[in-house]
Structure formats: C-alpha cells, structure tokens
Curated annotation (Swiss-Prot):
Family: Belongs to the ubiquitin-conjugating enzyme family.
Protein EC: 2.3.2.23
Stretch forming the signal peptide: none
The organism of origin for this protein: Acanthamoeba polyphaga mimivirus (APMV)
Enzyme class: transferase
Disulphides: none
Molecular functions per Gene Ontology: ATP binding; ubiquitin conjugating enzyme activity
Pathway named in the protein's UniProt entry: Protein modification; protein ubiquitination
Domain named UBC core: residues: 4-154
Annotated keywords: ATP-binding, Nucleotide-binding, Transferase, Ubl conjugation pathway
GO biological process: protein ubiquitination
Regions annotated as coiled coil: none
The name this protein goes by in its record: Probable ubiquitin-conjugating enzyme E2 L460
PROSITE patterns: UBC_2
C-alpha cells in the first residue's frame, strides 16, 4: 500500500466530515471500527422518488490501490431496484472497471447512487423482471417499490 493512497483516502474522509453540514440531509458516512478501508454510508432516499425519506445503509470497501481501482459498494439494507441485485451489488457505470478513473471519488459515487435511486436505468439492469415491469406497467412497478420500502426500510432519522 502506497502512503499516497492512504493519504488520498484520509483526505477524502476528512473533507466529507469537514463538509458534513452540506451533506447531512442526504447522507452520513462513518468508518467501520476506525478502518480507513471500510466505510458505512447511510443515504436518504431522494425527494419525489419512490424511495423518498427512507434510509439505506451501504458499505464501501476501498482497495489497497484506490483511487486507481474503484471501491466495492453495496447496499446492506435490502432494496428493490432494477440496478441492484439481491446481494446488494450495484450496477453503475462508475463502479465498473472500464467506467472508473482516479479523478472520481467517494462523494461522486454517493451522488451517483442517489441519482440512480431517483432515475433507474432499465437499459442496464441487474433485475430484468423489475426493468420489464418499469417499462410495461409503471403503476405496478411503483407500488411494488413502495410496498417493499415500507416492509424492509426504515425512515430517515439523522
């Protein structure tokens, strides 16, 4: 592990904490057991989305060669979303090897996930059944997502 990699991770974490008032209504980040490579994120479902005001916990695992490779990001809170599989893995271009570059950072990942909650991508789904429902019966899709959130998610209380 290169000390500049650790410094980059520490700088990102410090910046997020220093600016936390800017993000407090959208997400919260904490290291897990003071492990610089493992972060817990709580995201508030975006306004006017099917996930509005629900709290979603994610885990971010940074590798030894971050920022030269993307972190592993997954939902811990169960979620019904066409771009998230049942293990919590997220289908998002910037998390893929060919979509990642070292100029991206954790903040850009989090904002991209928040946007994905509001604007799912039916062209690149993990859950093709949900994507098909979204395209063919939006009312049933909306109900399915809302019902799942009510059952499996907690409201944002941060």
């Amino acid at each position: 592990m290169n000390s500049s990699n650790i410094r980059r991770i520490q700088n990102e974490y410090n910046k997020i904490n220093n600016d936390k008032n800017l993000y407090a209504d959208s997400f919260q980040i904490n290291m897990v057991d003071e492990n610089i490579f493992l972060w817990k994120v709580n995201i508030k479902g975006p306004e006017n989305s099917l996930y509005e005001n629900y709290n979603f916990e994610l885990e971010i695992e940074l590798s030894n060669d971050y920022p030269y490779s993307s972190p592993k990001v997954k939902f811990i809170t169960p979620i019904q979303h066409m771009n998230v599989n049942d293990k919590g893995d997220i289908c998002l271009n910037i998390l893929k090897k060919d979509g990642w570059n070292a100029s991206l950072n954790i903040i850009s990942i989090i904002w991209s996930i928040i946007v994905l909650l509001d604007q799912p991508n039916p062209e690149d789904p993990f859950n093709s059944e949900l994507a098909s429902l979204y395209r063919n019966d939006k009312l049933s899709y909306d109900k399915k997502i809302r019902d799942y959130c009510k059952t499996h998610s907690k409201l944002w209380t941060f």
